[in-house]
Amino acid sequence: MISIIDDDRSVREAVKSLIRSLGYEAVTFASAEEYLGADGAHESECVITDVQMPGMTGMDLQDRLIADGYRRPIIFMSAMSAEDTGATAASRFLRKPFSDERLIDCLDRALKSPPPNSCRS
């Protein structure tokens, strides 16, 4: 299962549609808090999250997941550059807007290699 977290519904739905077309189960959440409150959230094979969201940011979510023992890939999405968001060089990062091919490549590399691994665009 791939979890997609973004406060923009159109982004959530577009990413979910692409992920499902690749044969993965995908679930969406409008906020980091909604994701954390969901049953089985920590069972995600990968989390794809927006960086800038109301309430808990994507970076805050990463910190929380790591503290809770989550050791699977996290891919960040943002209209800002990785440097402007505070994403580290080791973070998986997609700058919006990104192509389907870019997301597919980043997801493929994230799922095939242990964190961290960069796939910047």
What kind of feature is each model-predicted range?
Residues R9-V27:
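Two-component/phosphorelay signaling modules centered on CheY-like receiver
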Residues A30-S31, T57-D60:
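Acidic catalytic/metal-coordinating carboxylates
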Residues D60, M80-R95, E101, D105:
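Alpha4 helix (beta4-alpha4-beta5 surface) of REC/receiver domains from two-component response regulators
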